[in-house]
Design a protein with these regions (language model features):
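Exported/periplasmic ABC-transporter solute-binding proteins
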Residues: 44-70, 74, 78-79, 83, ...
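Sec/Tat signal peptide C-region and signal peptidase I cleavage site
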Residues: 38-44
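Bacterial N-terminal signal peptides
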Residues: 27-38
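Charged/polar low-complexity intrinsically disordered segments
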Residues: 10, 20-22
Length: 276
């Protein structure tokens, strides 16, 4: 009996040791699995990357605050001209939702398979003539643009920015384009166009009404709204992108739906957009 006891003790120690090793391996494996999955899950559910046209910058910053407060989903905004953003999306940029300044670019992305559905109008933009030059006050008939005192007129590049298209249409509507085309300086986006005017690199220029109504712009310069019959209505559309559906469907869908909510529409209206 005395000889048997050490043997039993050794067997028990061996079993316990092997059990502990197996448990450690399982714990390590679970830690690796959950450590790898958790960031992906959190990112998919808690962050949405939204490409926005530059005219939407100020309105979307306010919308972002309200959306994050209501849903707990973080919003990352990527701002540029609609044309440039569209090109980035076509080249594989990892954006979830595209909020354009027109319907053409999002429709083109849908036609090429980069968006999950046809674009839907979320707002209609309005064009203004704005200056930050002291003593200069824009007039609705635009004839003052012919003055020798005005040497540079800023517009967004019509090749990539819908508000640039509207600006050129306006000048042609008033039969001023040919006489003013040598004065035109082009911003890459409506945001850069605003910078040209704000820094007085241009004397005056065409930007979005949403920009001059932003709190950051209060009291800066003078502006006049361009009559809506002078240019094609700026119908602004949004789409969920294929990347958003494939990798972040819940967050992308939630943000897209919010754009058309009463809360979002009131924000757009506050910034001078025409809404339903």
């Amino acid at each position: 009996m005395l000889n048997a006891t050490p043997c039993l003790f050794e067997i028990n120690v061996d079993l316990v040791g092997r059990y502990k090793k197996k448990m450690k391996k399982c714990a390590l494996l679970l830690a690796i699995i959950f450590g790898w999955l958790q960031p992906l899950t959190v990112h998919a559910q808690k962050t949405v990357t939204v490409a926005i046209a530059a005219n939407m910058q100020f309105a979307m910053e306010q919308l972002k605050v309200e959306f994050e407060k209501e849903t707990g989903i973080k919003v990352e905004l990527i701002t540029s001209s609609s044309g440039k953003l569209s090109a980035q999306i076509a080249e594989g940029a990892p954006y979830d939702v595209f909020v354009s300044a027109d319907m053409k670019y999002p429709q083109d992305l849908y036609d090429k398979g980069f968006a999950t559905g046809t674009p839907k109008v979320y707002a209609i933009g309005q064009l203004v003539l704005w200056t930050s030059k002291p003593g200069l006050k824009p007039t609705a008939d635009l004839k003052q643009l012919l003055s020798a005192a005005i040497k540079k007129i800023a517009v967004a590049n019509p090749k990539t920015a819908p508000y640039g298209v509207a600006a050129e249409e306006t000048l042609k509507y008033y039969k001023l384009y040919d006489g003013l085309k040598d004065k035109l300086v082009y911003g890459e986006s409506i945001g850069q166009t605003q910078q040209f005017i704000e820094t007085q690199a241009a004397d005056i220029g065409f930007i979005a009404k949403s920009q001059v109504l932003a709190a950051e712009m209060k009291g800066r310069g003078a502006w006049v709204e361009i009559p809506g019959n002078a240019y094609t209505p700026i119908r602004q559309g949004a789409v969920i992108l294929k990347h958003g559906k494939d990798t972040n469907n819940a967050a992308a869908g939630t943000f897209y739906a919010y754009i058309f909510s009463d809360a979002a529409q009131q924000i757009f209206k506050k910034f001078g957009y025409i809404v339903n």
